[in-house]
Curated annotation (Swiss-Prot):
<keyword id="KW-0597">Phosphoprotein</keyword>
<dbReference type="InterPro" id="IPR005843">
    <property type="entry name" value="A-D-PHexomutase_C"/>
</dbReference>
<comment type="similarity">
    <text>Belongs to the phosphohexose mutase family.</text>
</comment>
<dbReference type="InterPro" id="IPR036900">
    <property type="entry name" value="A-D-PHexomutase_C_sf"/>
</dbReference>
<dbReference type="InterPro" id="IPR005845">
    <property type="entry name" value="A-D-PHexomutase_a/b/a-II"/>
</dbReference>
<dbReference type="GO" id="GO:0004615">
    <property type="term" value="F:phosphomannomutase activity"/>
</dbReference>
<dbReference type="InterPro" id="IPR005841">
    <property type="entry name" value="Alpha-D-phosphohexomutase_SF"/>
</dbReference>
<dbReference type="GO" id="GO:0009252">
    <property type="term" value="P:peptidoglycan biosynthetic process"/>
</dbReference>
<protein>
    <recommendedName>
        <fullName>Phosphoglucosamine mutase</fullName>
        <ecNumber>5.4.2.10</ecNumber>
    </recommendedName>
</protein>
<dbReference type="InterPro" id="IPR006352">
    <property type="entry name" value="GlmM_bact"/>
</dbReference>
<dbReference type="InterPro" id="IPR005846">
    <property type="entry name" value="A-D-PHexomutase_a/b/a-III"/>
</dbReference>
<comment type="function">
    <text>Catalyzes the conversion of glucosamine-6-phosphate to glucosamine-1-phosphate.</text>
</comment>
<feature type="binding site">
    <location>
        <position position="249"/>
    </location>
    <ligand>
        <name>Mg(2+)</name>
    </ligand>
</feature>
<keyword id="KW-0413">Isomerase</keyword>
<dbReference type="GO" id="GO:0000287">
    <property type="term" value="F:magnesium ion binding"/>
</dbReference>
<keyword id="KW-0479">Metal-binding</keyword>
<keyword id="KW-0460">Magnesium</keyword>
Length: 458
C-alpha cells in the first residue's frame, strides 16, 4: 500500500504547509488515537490508552504539541507531555512508563522552518509500516469527538529528564568513570541541551557545552552533527580530550579526537565493534546501509566481523538486526544502534559506548581506526519535484552503466530518492578520488537533464 504522508522517519515538512499545519496535525493525533483505541492489547477496558509527547526546541513545537494533544484527547487517549526531550528519551520513557505509544515533534537535523511527527510503539521502537498505514487510512475518516466522559486527559510530567539521565548513565559500566577527561559536547541548540552535559558531568567529565542555548530558531544552525567544524574548533580551542556532536533531536552522533579530526557513524560503529570483539562480547555482526563506506566493510571483514547492508534509514537497519539476532548497526550520518543498550538510535548512549572503549583500552580514536581506510566518497544531492522517477530515466541508466565500467570494480555507485526531501542522492565511492568525483558529477548531470526533459523542474 502506498503511503501519502509517512516517509522513512515519520511525517515531515515545512511548517505551515500540509502536512505540518495545526489542522492536519490535530487530525493526525486523532487518527493515531483511534488506531490505539482499536488495538488496546492487554489494556483493561476501563482504562484510557496513554501516549507520551516530546519535542525538540523549534518554535513551532509548541503549536504542534497543542494540536496533537487536542487530537489525541478527542479520540479518548490520555496524553503525557515532557517538553523538550531527545527522540531516544521518548522511546525509552514510553517503554519504561508502560505507555501505549510515544510521539516526537521534530525534524531532526533540518532547520527550524521544518518540523515533523514520528511515533514509537509501546516497546520503544519505531512503528511498523502496517501501523503507519492504518493511521493514514484513519486520516480519511471524519473527526468525531468521543463523548465528554470518554475524553482523554493531558498533563505534563516533571521528572522526564532526570529519568532519562539515569538511564543513559546506566549504559556505562559502574566500574568506570570519565574523571580526568575534558569533553566538548555540541547539543545543536536542540533537545539534548539540558541532558547531555548533565550525563557527562555526572559521570565525572569536565564538560564544555556548546550549542546549548536554544531560542526556537537556532536549532542545527552552524552546529551539531551536520556541521562538525563547530565541534572541531571548540575541541582545539579548549584543549579537550574528545568532542561529541549531536543533532537537533539527539539521535545522531559524530565525534572528534583531541586534534579536531571528525569521526562519522561508520568509524564509530567500527570502534564499538572492534572493542566488543577484543573484549569478547561482540554478538554476531554489523548492519550498515547502502551508504556505508566500502572501507568500513573491508575493515570489518579483516577482523572477521560479518557485515550486511540495509536500505537507508535506521528503521531498516533495525529490521535487519532483528532478523539476524545482532545488536550493532548504524549509518554514516551518525544513527547508531546498540540494541543491547537501547531500542533505538541514541546519540548520548552511543557516545558512551565509544567512551567505554577508549577508557577500557587507553586507546585514542585514531589508534582504534588506524586500520580503517575510508575510501573517497562523493555525495551530490539533486533537487527534484515530486513525481520524478529514476526508473523512467533511461539516460540515467546508461550513465550509471558507463560509470560502472569506468570504475572497473574499484568502487560503488548508489542512486536513491530521499525519504524526507524532494532529492535524488547520487553517491559514488572508490579508491581513486578524482575518478570518483568525475563519475558522481557525470551521473548528477544525467539526473538533472532527465528531470528537465520530463518537464519536472529541478
Amino acid at each position: 500500500m502506498g503511503r501519502k504522508y509517512f516517509g522513512t522517519d515519520g511525517v515531515r515538512g515545512k511548517v505551515g504547509e500540509t502536512p505540518i499545519t495545526p489542522e492536519f496535525v490535530m487530525r493526525l493525533g486523532y487518527a493515531a488515537g483511534k488506531v490505539l483505541v482499536s488495538d488496546r492489547g492487554s489494556l483493561p477496558a476501563n482504562e484510557h490508552p496513554t501516549v507520551l509527547i516530546g519535542k525538540d526546541t523549534r518554535i513551532s513545537g509548541y503549536m504542534l504539541e497543542a494540536a496533537l494533544e487536542a487530537g489525541f484527547t478527542a479520540a479518548g487517549v490520555n496524553v503525557l507531555m515532557t517538553g523538550p526531550m531527545p527522540t531516544p528519551a521518548v522511546a525509552y520513557l514510553t517503554r519504561a512508563l508502560r505507555l501505549q505509544a510515544g510521539v516526537v515533534i521534530s525534524a531532526s537535523h533540518n532547520p527550524f522552518e521544518d518540523n515533523g511527527i514520528k511515533f514509537f510503539s509501546a516497546s520503544g521502537q519505531k512503528l511498523p509500516d502496517s501501523v503507519e498505514e492504518a493511521i493514514e487510512a484513519a486520516l480519511d475518516q471524519p473527526l468525531a469527538t468521543v463523548a465528554a466522559r470518554q475524553l482523554g486527559r493531558a498533563r505534563r510530567i516533571e521528572d522526564a529528564a532526570a529519568r532519562y539521565i539515569e538511564f543513559c548513565k546506566s549504559t556505562f559500566p559502574n566500574r568506570l568513570d570519565l574523571r580526568g577527561m575534558r569533553i566538548v559536547v555540541d547539543c545543536a541548540h536542540g533537545a539534548t541541551y539540558h541532558v547531555a552535559p548533565h550525563v557527562l558531568h555526572e559521570l565525572g567529565a569536565e564538560v564544555v557545552a556548546i550549542g546549548n542555548e536554544p531560542n526556537g530558531f537556532n536549532i542545527n544552525e552552524a552546529c551539531g552533527a551536520t556541521h562538525t567544524p563547530a565541534l572541531a574548533d571548540a575541541v582545539r580551542a579548549h584543549h579537550a580530550d574528545i568532542g561529541i556532536s549531536l543533532d537537533g533531536d539527539g539521535d545522531r552522533l559524530m565525534m572528534a579526537d583531541a586534534h579536531g579530526r571528525i569521526y562519522d557513524g561508520d568509524q564509530l560503529v567500527y570502534v564499538i565493534a572492534r572493542h566488543r570483539l577484543e573484549t569478547g562480547y561482540m554478538k554476531g555482526g554489523v548492519v550498515g546501509t547502502l551508504m556505508t563506506n566500502l572501507g568500513t566493510e573491508h575493515a570489518l571483514a579483516r577482523i572477521h566481523v560479518p557485515f550486511e547492508r540495509a536500505k537507508v534509514g535506521d528503521r531498516y537497519v533495525l529490521k535487519r538486526l532483528h532478523a539476524n539476532g545482532w545488536f550493532l548497526g548504524g549509518e554514516t550520518s551518525g544513527h547508531i544502534l546498540c540494541l543491547d543498550k537501547h531500542t533505538t538510535g541514541d546519540g548520548i548512549v552511543s557516545s558512551l559506548q565509544v567512551l567505554r572503549a577508549l577508557r577500557e583500552t587507553g586507546k585514542t580514536l585514531d589508534a582504534f581506526t588506524a586500520d580503517l581506510e575510508t575510501y573517497p566518497q562523493v555525495m551530490i544531492n539533486v533537487p527534484v519535484v515530486k513525481g520524478f522517477r529514476l526508473s523512467d530515466a533511461a539516460a540515467v541508466t546508461v550513465a550509471v552503466a558507463d560509470a560502472e565500467s569506468a570504475l572497473n570494480g574499484s568502487g560503488r555507485i548508489v542512486l536513491r530518492a530521499s525519504g524526507t526531501e524532494p532529492l535524488i542522492r547520487v553517491m559514488v565511492e572508490g579508491r581513486d578520488g578524482d575518478l570518483v568525483r568525475r563519475t558522481a558529477e557525470m551521473i548528477a548531470d544525467a539526473v538533472r537533464a532527465a528531470a528537465a526533459a520530463s518537464d519536472i523542474a529541478v
